[in-house]
Every structure is written in C-alpha cells, then in structure tokens.
Amino acid sequence: MVYGELIYHPVVTKLLKFLDSSASREKLLRLLQYLCRFLTFYTFKRNFNIETIQLIKKIQSSIGISRKPLRFLKNLPHLKNLNKIYSNELLDSTLKIGDLIKNFGYALYFQFDTLQWLKLLGLLTSKNSGSLYFKIDKLAANFWLIGLTGSIITDLRNLKISYDSNKALLNEINSQNNNSNNDTLDEKLIEQNNDLILKNNEKINLNKRDLFKNILDSLIALKGSQLIDLNDGVLGFAGIITSIIGIEDIWNATKA
C-alpha cells in the first residue's frame, strides 16, 4: 500500500516524466559538469593533492562528452525558426531582429557542437579537417555568444514592452479615478487593467530572470571566444546558476 502510494505520488510521477526528457538529462549533466569545473578551481586553490584534481577534471571531461549526443541535431529547430520568424510580418521589428540573431547563432553553435563531439571521439582530426580542427572550439563559443546576444536583445525589448504597457494601463486607471463624474467610473475596466498589470509583472519577472541567465552564460561564451579572461571558479559558479535555472524551467514545464 505504502509502496503503491509512493510510486503513484504526483511528485514521483512528475520526476519520472522530467527524467524521461533528454533536455532535462542534459541540463542535469550540465550542472554536474560546471560543478566539477568549480571544484577543480577550488581544490587547486586549497592545495588538494594532484590525484584529486585530476579525477575531478576527468569526471568533468567525461560528462562533457556525454552531453554532446543529447544535443545532436538540436540545430534543426533553430533553422526552422529562422524561416518562420523571417516570414512573420506582424512581429515587432526589434523582437524579430533579436530572434533572428538568436536562432542564427544557436543553429551554428549546435552545428559546431556536433563537430566538437566528433573531435572528442577522434572521428574528426587535423588530417581530415585541416585548420578547422583547431578553430572548432572558438567558433562554437563565438556562435553561442551571438545566440545569447540575440536572446538578450529580445529580453530587453520584452521588458520595455511590458513596462510601457503597465505605464499606459496605470495612466488609464488614474484617468478613471480622477474623473469628477463618478457615474462614468468604469470599475470593470479598472479591474481588467489591474489584471493586465499583474500579468505584465509576471512577464517582467520571467524576462529579468532569463536576462540574468543569458548574461551569466555570456561570461562563459566570452571566455570561450577568448575575449575575456576569467578563472574556472567564476565560470563554474556561473554555469551552476544557469544550469539550476534551466532545470527549474524544465521542471515547471513538466506536467505531473
């Protein structure tokens, strides 16, 4: 009886569905990979023995390879989105530019991510790929940074749209409240506007959260692009935070 109640508990059911998704498994592996990256820095600074540091690095490398096949062909949805967004004449121009940059960057990022996988497996070598072999990692980081830049543009634009909408709604409410003729006071309209403001506030919080995540990921991409120099402690911590946010997003989207 207790066993049955546990197995069919809504949280357990949701957890099983969560773990059944390749996206959630990839995010969990990402969390472990960046945790290892942070621990490598921490153990080195704390003068741990070299065997411990090398073990953590080995685990980090193994997890990195394990993540690659879970992202295989992930560029295809972004290529599809490029065509859909480009054809959408009704989309806000700034959002359209941001989404095009985002999907262009991610499409090529995941393409080079696949090449990184082939490189790690030894199927792609300097002999059969020439100078590209030595540029793959940097190019992948470059296109990831481009994708993140597009995401940041859309986040900022969505924030402005929501703030402007709230401002207009508040002005309308104040206009109704300040009307000297109480008979014309539209309580229903005010209530509707308040509901819209609450919905906009929810969007604002989500956009701020996404913006924070994209900025942290940009630090990792900037390091990979060799545009800034940050230690593994900072990068590992940034990766841990963004991985947790990604896991939380997938968990919230999973239906029990």
Swiss-Prot record:
Keyword Transit peptide attributed: no
Subcellular location: Peroxisome membrane
Membrane topology type: Peripheral membrane protein
Effect of residue 73 to S: In strain: S2
Keywords of the record: Membrane, Peroxisome, Peroxisome biogenesis
This protein's GO CC annotations: peroxisomal membrane
Secretion signal, residue range per the UniProt entry: none
A Gene Ontology BP annotation from the UniProt entry: peroxisome fission
Functional description taken from the UniProt entry: Involved in peroxisomal proliferation. Could participate in peroxisomal elongation or fission. May be involved in parceling of peroxisomes into regular quanta.
Family: Belongs to the peroxin-11 family.
Protein name in the entry: Peroxisomal membrane protein PMP30B
Organism: Candida boidinii (Yeast)
